[in-house]
C-alpha cells in the first residue's frame, strides 16, 4: 500500500527487502511496476553492494571461475538475534512472510547474481526446535535469559516471550536449489549460533572462491594451477564506523545518492525485479518445507514474465 501511494504520487521509492510478504502481494506489485516502471522502486538488497559482491563481480568479469557448478552457503545469527525474531512482529508469517523470506532473501538474491540465472527447482526442510519451551535455559539451571533479551523491543506487536513465543516461524532451515543452467546451491540458516557466520564457497569450472561476510575474508583459487588469485579481508572496515551489513550500507547509500543526484553512469547492482524473484524463491522454499515436496518454479516464472517487467 505504501509503495502504491508513492508511485501514484510520482515519487521514487526506496523499499526495504523483501518488499512483499506473500505471492498475492507479489503479483499486485508486478501490476504496479508494469504501470509505473521498475526504475521508480529501489530496493535494499544490500549484499549486492558489499565489497565481497564487488570483488566477485570483478573476478567473474575476468572469467576467474568459469561456469559456476555449485555453491555451499549459510547465514547463521546469534542467540540474541534469534530471540529478537521470536519476540518481534517478524515472528508471525502473516506479517513477515516467514524467516527465510524476511532474513535470507538477501542471500538468495546474492547467489542468483553469481549463478546468473533463476532457480528452477527447490526443496527444503526445517522447523522450530531451539526456541521451544523444553529448551529454555531456565530449565537447564541458568538464572536468566538476558542473552536472548539483549535487543530492546518496545514497539508494534512485540512480546517478551522467547522460548514460549507464539511465533510460527522456523528457527532453522536447509534448502537445496537447482538453477536453470544446472548449477546447484545448498543453503543452511539457524538463529541460535553463538559464533555466527555468513559463509559461502562457490565452485566453478576454472576456479573457486570462499568468503565470510561476518569475518570479512574473501579468497579465490585457480582450479588448474591451485594458485591463490585473490586474498582480501574487508573486516577492518567494520571497526571504523562502517559496520552496517559489513560496510555495505554506506556503499549502498553512496551508490544510490550518485544514481539519483549526481547523474552516475553506473547502473545500480540490483533492482526491484531481482527482489521479487528472490522473494518468490523464498516463498517456494517454504512451500517445499510445508508440503514435503520438490517445487518446480517453471509456472511461477512464466506468470512473472507475463508482466514483461524486464523490458518496460
Ranges and model annotations:
Residues 1-48, 63:
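Beta-strand-loop-alpha-helix segment that lines the small-molecule cofactor/substrate pocket
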Residues 34, 180, 210, 215, ...:
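C-terminal helix-rich "cap/oligomerization" subdomain common to oxidoreductases
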Residues 4-7, 30, 57, 108-112, ...:
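Non-transmembrane alpha-helical segments in soluble domains
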Residues 37-42, 47-163, 292:
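Predominantly a Rossmann-like dinucleotide-binding segment in NAD(P)-dependent oxidoreductases
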Residues 126-127, 132-139, 146-251:
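NAD(P)-dinucleotide binding in Rossmann-like oxidoreductases
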Residues 95-101, 160-164, 238-245, 264-272:
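Active-site rim elements
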Residues 26, 53, 107-108, 249, ...:
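A general structural signal for well-ordered alpha-helical segments in protein cores
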Residues 10, 86-94, 231-238:
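Short glycine/proline- and charge-enriched loop/turn segments
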